[in-house]
Every structure is written in structure tokens, then in C-alpha cells.
């Protein structure tokens, strides 16, 4: 291996990359060029040492290289970084103000970064006050009788629905329910939960050949949605099956899965009740509604 070393004064002889140094106090440099030849080819290694003061004899340079070489070998083994301890071979006294391209790993770099675990949301954050109300039912007409369809402006209907829902009494229910509905644009601040109820809507009707048929619709509604609004929403979906018939059905419902034997008839007072009031529980998950508009229960126009 051939090696040459040359001392320079000034920054004119520095490589272009080192000329970008803004500190003009480094006016002394030592350039060492190593040439190593093997069967694979020739390897050229360049080492430049900068200093603010004149460098001493070449022996001091060789001593500095001897001190930093173990550090360079340690840096080539990333697995041993955590086992490195401060020793004589790492701490190099820079009494002459030398700056080298070879640097040892600092203690801060050897520390492992700990990832902060994401904070999991608790159930207390799922209160109604923090839930954004859905607008998917805002266009539903709000009427007192299910047989009459509203043609009013949706904006006016929303205002009327908010007014009527806020004045609804809770005396018919043993449990205290919130005074707002899913149509409200704001919350009352009460710490109550609103669950989504899976509603199955079974329509019994007659086809064009006057044969008895049935159609099934499924949707989800908040537990504080009134039964009347649920029926009106489904009525808009089943207009094709009704043809030109008046919608004067016989209604019945059952909590949970669809069961004809366990179904209960719907009275006029039940139409103004919410799904939670109808099931007498806030934890209602499924409701089935049977709507019979067959020939015995319908009136042709």
C-alpha cells in the first residue's frame, strides 16, 4: 500500500466540497492519499485534516490516526453500538483544534428512541355531546298522520320538526329521555347515549296481477327517532310496490327478529313515540315493522 502526505496552508487546495466551510480560521490542512492495489482493482483513499494552527510533525498526525481508527471500526458494526463505553480509544483530545471527517457516535445518538403509544379513546368520549348528528334524514317530511305526504319546503319542515320534538312530553315513559331528536341541529349537553337501531320494514302488498306479495327493506335509525318518521321514510322507498294505492296500512311491530306471532299492533299514540320509548329500553338494537296494505286493508283511488 502506497501512502503520500502533504501539508498545505490556506483553503485554496481544499476539495470543492470542503470549500463551502464558512469558517475561514481553518487555514492549515494535511492531505493524505493511500493507494491499495488488489486483484479486484485499485482503491484510492483520501483523508484531509483541517486545523486552525500549524500542524506538528507527521508523528502527531499518525498518533491521531491511531486513536480514531478503533472508533471507525466500531462504527462499521452497528450491532455493537449499544455496548460501546467511553474509553481512551474514543475520547480524543482536540488540543490543536483539529476537525476530522471521522467522528465517533455521541451518547445521544446511541439512545434508542421510544415511540409514544397512541392514546386510546375511552367510552366516556362517546357521549352524545361529542357525537356529530347525521343529516341523512333531514329531508324527511314531518307530519302527524302517516297517510298524508308532505310537499312543503324541506327547510320549513325541519323547523317545524324541531319545534314539535322539543315540546314532546316524557310523561309516558318511566325512563327520562333526551328532549331532542335526531333532526335537531344541536345537543342539549346531557350525558346520554344514542344508539343506532337496525329496522326491518316488511311490506305486504298486491302485485299487478292482484297476487299477494311482500317486499323487505332494511335501514338504520337513531334510537331517539320517532316511529312516524321511520314509516314515512320507508313509504318513500316502497312507492313502486304500492302502484297507485293509498297508503292506509295496518301496522304492527316486534322487538328483535321478525316474528308474526309476537308482533304487536301499532296504535295512534305509538306513532309519536321514539324507537327507545316503543321498546321501553335505550339498548334496543333491532326492530321489525310489518305493514299490511293488501286488498282487505287498502282503498283504491
From Swiss-Prot:
Protein name listed in UniProt: Uncharacterized protein C38C10.3
Sequence ranges of Low complexity compositional bias: 161-173
Native organism: Caenorhabditis elegans
Basic and acidic residues bias (residue ranges): 71-82
InterPro entries, per the entry: DUF508 (IPR007465)
Region (Disordered): 56-126, 149-173
Regions of compositional bias (Polar residues) in chain numbering: 93-102
